[in-house]
Amino acid sequence: MLFRSDDCGFGYKRQGNVELLERMSKEYDFKLIVIPKLELEGEIVSSTRVRRLLSEGRIEEANRLMEDPFMICGPVVHGNHMGAEVLQMPTANQIPAEDKLLPPKGVYVSRIRYKDEIHYGISNVGVKPTIEGKNPVGVETHLLDFAGDLYGKVVTVEFLTRIREERKFSSIEALKEEMQNNIAYARAWFEKNES
């Protein structure tokens, strides 16, 4: 059984189409099911549309088009320990594969899944410009009301909405103040949307 959209193209220069698949299904004895395009909010739902919305930071719009929220999954790695030691806000750091589609650099409201547990938090996608040093693009997540150890554990971070762009602050104190504002925003967002 083969499922394809009604506008599929495949093969050399995308010359293959539904008509070719229909002929091939008779010749090679398989069932072809053609799925019509789905429209939502006046546009066709497609992976191209989802990628465009994600690359523009329009997380909530992209999530409405998918069965599950946009997420990354991977092990928690050691960072420079600035979150716990300097900011008093421990973070779970992940370094996604270079070819992984990520939303634009910035801070996001996030939901974190680990085993059967669900936690809420804020996630920064980017290079942590306020912290000196050359940092790879990563995802750094502060879990609200969580005191466990996730190093080496595989966690899933779901991006729910964008709070702001990543930016360099004039001081660690200014960064800490902004992180508290981000946490307050996230708590209000969860209270409104998750209750």
Residue ranges and their predicted role:
Residues 1-2:
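Short, small-residue-biased leader/transition segments that mark boundaries at the very start
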Residues 7-12, 39-41:
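Short histidine/acidic/glycine/proline-rich micro-motifs that form metal-
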Residues 13-17, 46, 106:
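Residues at alpha-helix caps and immediate loop-helix transition turns in enzyme cores, especially N-
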Residues 14-22, 140:
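Charged helix-capping and loop-helix junction motifs
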Residues 24, 79-195:
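Phosphate/ribose-recognition catalytic cores of enzymes acting on nucleotide-derived substrates
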Residues 25-38, 45:
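A short, charged helix-loop
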Residues 30, 68, 110:
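Short glycine/serine/threonine/alanine-rich loop segments
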Residues 38-39, 43-92:
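Anionic-ligand-binding alpha/beta catalytic cores of soluble enzymes and soluble regulatory domains
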